[in-house]
């Protein structure tokens, strides 16, 4: 098949992180046609021929399928009451210390069946796809113990088999169960990680005030590295307790949150060739101060934007995340598009297949109903996504229902 009458393809190019000035570099192919064969982009031309079965883009903009590299989208229950607590002045840390927050989701998840969690999670994923996401990272983390974590892993694998999106599975050492010692639980998590090894690609840890210490995070990630897994870390969301420095000797693909990063952290991340993932939707949910992306980009650190959808931040709309990053973190629209495509794909080890509209890559394509790509973050209040292709298959059409 082919997609014809494309107003312009707007895409970064290449297979790896874009940093510094390169993060704002995009290619433009006007009046284009995309040929799709066997789920791949076979050819891109500037011809105008039209045959039966072609899809007419009607002059719209085409961008790469968006890549959401940090999510907590698999869980049971909800935390709507917590929203009102935060609105009345309670902080994230206060709610967590009271045994709620993440711990409430742990209880809700334990009390939900795998089928219930799958159904809830697929609704959230369908919404993400409707806003242009074609690849999504799926974390465990709300089980804490092996039986419940395996339930979440099974749900993640079932989502992977749905065909709606491409997935990358991550085991997350999330929070310390009440009454457990950190050292003992870290060793226990290593055992879970070993048993999950054949089904996941990444290991992640929440290293912050009220979560795991730098020493525990380092030990866990070092163990994961020895297993050959990719490494990610939540750091500097609540406070800066030295997680970046502690893990600087490891091959961490991305340091996520980074609200309280200092100059030493930025230089460390740049020097080891890693990246920073900004999560503006969570900052929005918590009403915190947004980190300044200019500090990272101008220092030569690749910046990624992800949704961080969770019970706290019930939002997987990467276009709204781009809007927030442009408005509050001083990113250019070009940088924001790169952050949600090739940089996010590279952080998941998928840069050779995902994140750009180029010949030979997976046909993950989003048709956007705008006249210019700069309107994408601007028109955040309406869904401008017309159609979404995943591996060459139409998985979302605004005028039709999902093919679940």
Swiss-Prot record:
UniProt-listed InterPro entries: Amidohydro-rel, HutI, Metal-dep_hydrolase_composite, Metal_Hydrolase
Major location (coarse): cytoplasm
UniProt catalytic activity: 4-imidazolone-5-propanoate + H2O = N-formimidoyl-L-glutamate
Cofactor remark: Binds 1 zinc or iron ion per subunit.
Binding-site list for Zn(2+): 70, 72, 234, 308
Binding-site residues for 4-imidazolone-5-propanoate, renumbered to this chain: 79, 142, 174, 237
Keywords carried by this UniProt record: Cytoplasm, Histidine metabolism, Hydrolase, Iron, Metal-binding, Zinc
CDD domains from the UniProt entry: Imidazolone-5PH
Residues the record lists as binding Fe(3+): 70, 72, 234, 308
Gene3D superfamilies: Metal-dependent hydrolases, Urease, subunit C, domain 1
Pfam families: Amidohydro_1
GO biological process terms on file: L-histidine catabolic process to glutamate and formamide; L-histidine catabolic process to glutamate and formate
Signal sequence segment: none
List of residues binding N-formimidoyl-L-glutamate: 142
Presence of the UniProt keyword Hydrolase in the record: yes
GO molecular function: imidazolonepropionase activity; iron ion binding; zinc ion binding
SUPFAM superfamilies in the record: Composite domain of metallo-dependent hydrolases, Metallo-dependent hydrolases
Needed cofactors: Zn(2+); Fe(3+)
EC number: 3.5.2.7
UniProt xrefs under HAMAP family: HutI
PANTHER family given in the database record: IMIDAZOLONEPROPIONASE, IMIDAZOLONEPROPIONASE-RELATED
Family to which the UniProt record says this protein belongs: Belongs to the metallo-dependent hydrolases superfamily. HutI family.
Function: Catalyzes the hydrolytic cleavage of the carbon-nitrogen bond in imidazolone-5-propanoate to yield N-formimidoyl-L-glutamate. It is the third step in the universal histidine degradation pathway.
Protein name stated in the entry: Imidazolonepropionase
Provenance organism: Thermoplasma volcanium (strain ATCC 51530 / DSM 4299 / JCM 9571 / NBRC 15438 / GSS1)
């Amino acid at each position: 098949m082919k997609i014809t009458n494309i107003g312009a393809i707007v895409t970064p190019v290449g297979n790896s992180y874009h940093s510094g000035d390169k993060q704002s570099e995009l290619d433009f192919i006007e009046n284009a046609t995309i040929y799709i064969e066997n789920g791949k982009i076979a050819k891109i031309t500037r011809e105008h021929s039209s045959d039966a079965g072609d899809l007419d883009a009607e002059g719209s903009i085409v961008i790469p399928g968006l890549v959401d590299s940090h999510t907590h989208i698999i869980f049971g229950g909800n935390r709507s009451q917590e929203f009102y607590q935060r609105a009345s002045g309670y902080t994230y840390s206060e709610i967590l210390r009271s045994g709620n927050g993440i711990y409430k989701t742990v209880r809700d998840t334990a009390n939900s069946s795998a089928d219930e969690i799958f159904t809830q999670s697929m609704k959230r994923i369908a919404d993400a796809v409707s806003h242009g996401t074609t690849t999504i990272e799926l974390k465990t983390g709300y089980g804490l113990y092996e039986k419940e974590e395996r339930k979440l892993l099974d749900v993640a694998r079932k989502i992977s088999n749905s065909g709606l999106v491409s997935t990358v599975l991550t085991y997350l050492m999330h929070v310390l169960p009440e009454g457990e010692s950190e050292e003992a639980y870290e060793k226990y998590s290593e055992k879970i990680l070993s048993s999950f090894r054949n089904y996941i690609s990444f290991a992640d840890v929440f290293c912050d005030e009220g979560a795991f210490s730098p020493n525990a995070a380092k030990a866990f990630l070092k163990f994961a590295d020895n297993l050959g897994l990719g490494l990610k870390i939540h750091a500097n969301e609540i406070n800066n307790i030295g997680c970046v420095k502690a893990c600087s000797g490891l091959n961490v693909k991305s340091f996520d949150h980074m609200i309280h990063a200092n100059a030493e952290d930025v230089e460390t991340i740049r020097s080891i060739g890693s990246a920073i993932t900004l999560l503006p939707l969570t900052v929005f949910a918590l009403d915190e101060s947004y980190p300044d992306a200019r500090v990272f980009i101008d220092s030569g650190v690749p910046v990624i934007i992800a949704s961080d959808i969770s019970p706290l931040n019930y939002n997987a709309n990467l276009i709204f995340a781009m809007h927030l990053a442009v408005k509050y973190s001083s990113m250019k629209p070009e940088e924001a598009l790169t952050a949600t495509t090739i940089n996010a794909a590279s952080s998941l080890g998928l840069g050779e297949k995902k994140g750009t509209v180029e010949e030979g890559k997976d046909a993950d394509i989003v048709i956007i109903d705008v006249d210019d790509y700069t309107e994408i973050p601007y028109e955040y209040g309406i869904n401008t996504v017309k159609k979404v292709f995943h591996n060459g298959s139409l998985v979302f059409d605004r005028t039709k229902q999902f093919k679940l």
